Amino acid sequence: ACEVTQLAVCASAILGGTKPSGECCGNL
């Protein structure tokens, strides 16, 4: 399961133009 905080970090990375890392980010 992915935590909401982790998803927020992934979203921020995507919006920032960088490649998100972490198992949760791979599901986006």
Swiss-Prot record:
> Which domain of life does this protein belong to?
Eukaryota
Give the matching SUPFAM superfamilies: Bifunctional inhibitor/lipid-transfer protein/seed storage 2S albumin (SSF47699)
Any one GO MF term held by the record is: lipid binding
Keywords in alphabetical order, please: Lipid-binding, Transport
Q: Its family?
A: Belongs to the plant LTP family. B11E subfamily.
The record describes the protein's role as: Binds specifically fatty acids. Possible structural role in association with these lipids.
Q: What is this protein called?
A: Non-specific lipid-transfer protein 2
Record the organism. Answer: Triticum aestivum (Wheat)
